[in-house]
């Protein structure tokens, strides 16, 4: 599940990962037409990966909630909180959380404090998480430093430990570009490996 403010690339990342998994070219025209999520959206990506000497065929199901906060007001009534109240009973397991922010908008990074509180109850003790920065292709506009990213990762880890003292999942940070495709193959592999590892920790 990718979470974060609106317009940080949650839907875009999942759409492009599907193309990467099928070795298709990134379609910039399609990307330009992606609109914000107003409900819980679903994307599926299947990838084949080798870990050690074992071949895995992993299907990833992405649940993409809105990035609108209830406190900010939403005329459609489809804030993150409202959508989660509807769908939370049907969400049985989250193997990976993508805390997503825009490298060029530092406020989206700082707002991850809000999102970790929002998904804490959805996690289990084996849920992995990735601190995911988007818009890596716009490096000249980056507002989030490497030191801030490292500090943010540690902050999220501590917050999750406070929420779930028996948490055994792994965490990392990664920065990607949906325009150039940079690091998306790495992200796809990490997601697949995280699902496998999460299921090994807690079948």
Can you say where each PLM-predicted feature lies in the sequence?
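TRAFAC-class small GTPase G-domain
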Residues: 1-202
């Amino acid at each position: 599940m990718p979470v974060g403010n609106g317009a940080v690339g949650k839907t875009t990342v999942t759409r492009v990962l599907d193309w990467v998994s099928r070795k298709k070219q990134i379609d910039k025209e399609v990307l330009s037409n992606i609109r914000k999520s107003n409900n819980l959206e679903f994307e599926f990506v299947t990838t084949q990966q080798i870990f050690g000497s074992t071949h895995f065929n992993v299907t990833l199901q992405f649940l993409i909630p809105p990035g609108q906060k209830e406190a900010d007001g939403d005329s459609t009534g489809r804030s993150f909180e409202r959508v989660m109240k509807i769908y939370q009973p049907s969400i049985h397991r989250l193997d990976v959380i993508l805390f997503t922010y825009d490298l060029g908008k530092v406020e989206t990074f700082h707002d991850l404090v809000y999102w970790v509180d929002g998904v804490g109850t959805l996690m289990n003790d084996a849920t992995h998480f990735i601190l995911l920065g988007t818009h890596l292709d716009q490096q000249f506009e980056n507002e989030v430093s490497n030191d801030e990213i490292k500090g943010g990762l540690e902050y999220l880890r501590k917050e999750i430990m406070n929420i779930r003292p028996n948490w055994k999942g792994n965490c990392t940070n990664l920065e990607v570009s949906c325009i150039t495709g940079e690091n998306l193959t790495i992200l796809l592999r990490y997601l697949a490996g995280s699902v496998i590892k999460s299921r090994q920790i807690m079948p």
